[in-house]
Amino acid sequence: RDSLLRAEAISFDKDSILRALDFVAFNDTTFLIPDYSGDSRFCWVNRQGKFLKKSGVIPSLNEEALKEARPALAQAWRSFIDYNPHNGVLVAATQLGEVLEIYNLQNGFHRVCLGPKGEPEFKLAGGYAIPDGIMGFSDVQVTNEAIYAVFHGHTFKEIMAQHQKEGRATDGGQYIYVFNLQGEPLCKYTLDRYITGFHVDERNKTITATDVNNDQPLSLIHISEP
């Protein structure tokens, strides 16, 4: 069997980085990390883990939470992110609700795409965000031509009901949404399985996906042109 050996470990500045649940490499010297303090949208750090700056804001319409409960709001807005250095497009897809944020770091373009399920919903308890509403996205990839995102769409009530009835709930999303680099919808793929993560190969028109509900978790999915 092949072994995965750690080449390097980077410790982030604990005084500036609240927690790091996802990251992307901006270039050879800089990483972007979602900011879970609620003060901004992203933290920038160097290869040594030193904090450089913050940028962006949480694009929520919940003015009360923005004023009084920003850390909890940031928890609810936890997002999966991806960045393509060739076109400069950075995308954040929310784990709750249905929000896609698009930033072009080369030309300054910024757009917030709000889907029918709306922004993340949560209940405040002891300063923490308790998820409500729906499970949203679980992965996102920015290719040279498009944005792909795995979408779930199940409400937490549906998830709990299935868990009570069957002893477990199906994990993952059955849909892959495809947008152009400006956030305009191109198409939606409905899969015959539920996936959590994926990698898109546009050249060969395939998607390698992970299905955690299956004993054979890796799947190869053939796709058509968006």
Describe the role of every protein-language-model region.
Residues D2, N46-Q48, N104-N107, N180-Q182:
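Short loop/turn segments that connect beta-strands within beta-propeller blades
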Residues S37-S40, G97-V99, H154-K157, N213-Q216:
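Short glycine/acidic-enriched loop and turn motifs that connect beta-strands
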Residues D2-S16, L52-L73, H110-P131, R193:
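Surface-exposed loop and turn segments in beta-propeller and other repeat-based domains
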Residues D28-D35, G88-T94, E145-H154, K205-D211:
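Short beta-strand elements that form the blades of beta-propeller/WD-repeat-like
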Residues V150-D171, S219:
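Short, conserved, GDST-rich strand-edge loop motifs in beta-rich repeat architectures
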Residues L21-N27, L73-H86, I134-T143, H199-D201:
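Structural signature of eukaryotic scaffold interfaces centered on beta-propeller domains
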Residues W44-N46, E166-Q182:
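Beta-propeller blade signature
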Residues S219-P226:
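Residue-level detector of conserved catalytic or cofactor/ligand-binding positions
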